[in-house]
């Protein structure tokens, strides 16, 4: 499989409630991530690039270029990293784009169409 880059996400078949975050559009999400993750969180000081956003919730898909699991969906809580809970914001990691498409976007799309709330799975 080729290396994931932000451009890798431009032409995937996005399904509601997810949408693509254009290059340069994600800096606000990246700032939010830096403000919310504290020491002990797996994404603390990680290089993270926002590539997708869930429009009906506070979920953002980040590309983590140098990580073994290069994709992470972060559910923002609007809490400060200073609050010190390394379990928040809730984060689900994915091993590949195919993994996120199957377990993330496709599952979220099915819940969205049914009007179901998504299930939070810790990973």
Predicted regions mapped to residue ranges:
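Negatively charged, low-complexity tracts enriched in Asp/Glu with abundant Ser/Thr
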Residues: 2-47
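Intrinsically disordered, low-complexity segments enriched in small/polar residues
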Residues: 22-24, 50, 82, 113
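Amphipathic, interaction-prone secondary-structure segments
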Residues: 35-68
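Helix-rich interaction surfaces within compact, conserved domain-sized segments
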Residues: 71-118
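Intrinsically disordered, low-complexity regulatory segments
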Residues: 1-11, 105-123
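Generic secondary-structure transition motif, activating predominantly at the C-termini of alpha-helices
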Residues: 13, 37-41, 52, 101, ...
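Charged interaction scaffolds used for protein-protein
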Residues: 3-19, 57, 61, 68-88
């Amino acid at each position: 499989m080729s290396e994931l880059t932000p451009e890798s996400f431009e032409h995937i078949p996005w399904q509601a409630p997810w949408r693509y975050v254009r290059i340069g559009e994600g800096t606000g999400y990246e700032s939010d991530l830096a403000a919310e993750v504290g020491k002990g969180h797996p994404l603390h000081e990680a290089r993270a690039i926002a590539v997708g956003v869930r429009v009906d919730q506070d979920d953002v898909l980040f590309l983590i270029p140098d990580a073994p699991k290069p994709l992470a969906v972060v559910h923002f809580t609007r809490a400060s990293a200073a609050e010190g809970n390394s379990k928040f914001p809730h984060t689900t990691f994915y091993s590949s784009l195919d993994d996120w498409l199957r377990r993330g976007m496709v599952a979220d799309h099915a819940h969205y169409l049914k009007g179901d709330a998504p299930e939070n799975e810790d990973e």
